[in-house]
A protein has these predicted regions:
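ATP-dependent adenylate-handling active sites, centered on carboxylate activation for C-N bond formation
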Residues: 1-162, 199-246, 306, 311, ...
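Short amphipathic alpha-helical segments and their helix-coil junctions
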Residues: 161-175, 221, 287-305, 325
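Active-site-adjacent bridging/hinge elements
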Residues: 31-38, 163-165, 190-193, 285-296
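Short hydrophobic-aromatic micro-motifs
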Residues: 72-74, 82, 182, 188-189, ...
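Structural motif
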Residues: 51, 171-184, 231-233, 298-315, ...
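Short Ser/Thr-interspersed hydrophobic loop/turn segments at strand-loop and sheet-helix junctions
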Residues: 184-199, 220, 317-324
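PAPS-dependent sulfotransferase catalytic core
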Residues: 246-305
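Short acidic alpha-helix initiation/capping motifs at coil-to-helix transition points
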Residues: 194-197, 232-233, 275-276
Length: 329
């Protein structure tokens, strides 16, 4: 499954592996013209608002797979176990600044931004702790944007049980990587598993996840951190195994993520639907949304002044569910 964007389309690599393994292979491309139907159906299949735009390709891939098989394998858990996400490095690369006062961190961050485009010090350095930086990276809204769109949320605090990112400051870099990985497992990955489960079961497809087998997790955790060299590499062990098992294929080492070019689609084929759904008077009233503020963000996205696909899609998902999927009891 691919898309009409070179940035996200990985169908070429899938075709390479299929040819190497001599399997039957079909390629389908999503674009802004056929995505609108997939978008609304996929959001409704989750049974609740889900701020993860990868529900689109997951839903469509499940639909395609269910035509020929009833059970499929998923690679979920691989990025968490083997440090595949960029955010592992984004947080860890600022670890050397941990003992400096905020004013010094801000000064160094500003100098690096002006001279080297934040090549060495990123925005994570400006948070009070690695856990807060981690929470910020996984958030769909900045605090300022969320409070501007829905002012009534400004004084609401998260439940005490939501403490996934409240990990203590680590003593060393390895402990930091361990805490980040644990937070990913009990945080974002749970959302990912729910997404995959609901998208697949909407088509009667059963998904099994080898990376989350207990013996696999225990084996990888038993290897420790150093063997992965997570500050330098992502999924080092998996790439080494792949190159050994499939020497004829050059691995794709730049992670694209299982996603679609929603930034572009919102500006083109999906624009009318997003304006209609998000600026609906009843929707804005129901959720106490500051309609002019939301319209301004949507306009700025359409005009390419900002890329707000994540908050826009999250609210769009809420709007679809609220109108067509919500069941009041």
């Amino acid at each position: 499954l691919g898309s009409d964007s070179d940035k996200y389309n990985e169908s070429y690599y899938a075709e390479q592996y299929s040819e190497y393994l001599k399997t039957k292979h079909n390629t389908t491309l999503l674009n802004s013209n056929n995505a609108i139907d997939v978008l609304e159906k996929s959001v409704l299949s989750t049974g609740e608002p889900l701020g993860d735009l990868s529900i689109l390709p997951t839903w469509e891939l499940s639909k395609l797979a269910s035509k020929t098989v009833t059970v499929a394998l998923s690679g979920d858990g691989g990025d968490e176990l083997f440090f595949g996400y960029e955010r592992f490095q984004s947080i860890a690369n600022n670890h050397w600044l941990k003992k400096l006062p905020y004013s010094m961190k801000y000064l160094l961050w500003g100098l690096d931004r002006l001279t080297l485009n934040n090549s060495y010090i990123n925005d994570c350095a400006l948070y009070k702790s690695p856990g807060e930086a981690h929470f910020g990276l996984n958030s769909r809204f900045s605090d300022g944007m969320l409070n501007n769109i829905i002012p009534s949320l400004a004084n609401i605090t998260l439940p005490e049980e939501y403490n996934n990112y409240n990990y203590n400051p680590p003593n060393d870099i390895n402990e930091l990587f361990h805490r980040i990985r644990k937070a990913e497992y009990y945080g974002m990955m749970q959302k990912t598993l729910a997404k995959v489960d609901r998208a697949s079961m909407a088509h009667g497809l059963e998904i099994r996840v080898p990376f989350l087998k207990k013996t696999m997790i225990e084996k990888v955790l038993g290897l420790g951190i150093n063997i992965h060299q997570p500050q330098k590499f992502r999924k080092k062990i998996l790439y080494q195994l792949l190159e050994k098992k499939m020497p004829g294929i050059q691995p794709q080492k730049k992670k694209k993520g299982f996603s679609v070019p929603l930034t572009m689609w919102i500006r083109t084929g999906l624009k009318d639907s997003f304006y209609q759904r998000l600026l609906d008077d009843q929707f804005c009233h129901t959720y106490d949304i500051n309609k002019p503020a939301l319209e301004n963000i949507l306009d700025n996205h359409i005009n390419k002044q900002i890329d707000a696909k994540w908050p826009i899609f999250t609210l769009y998902s809420l709007a679809i569910w609220s109108k067509d999927g919500r069941v009041d009891v």
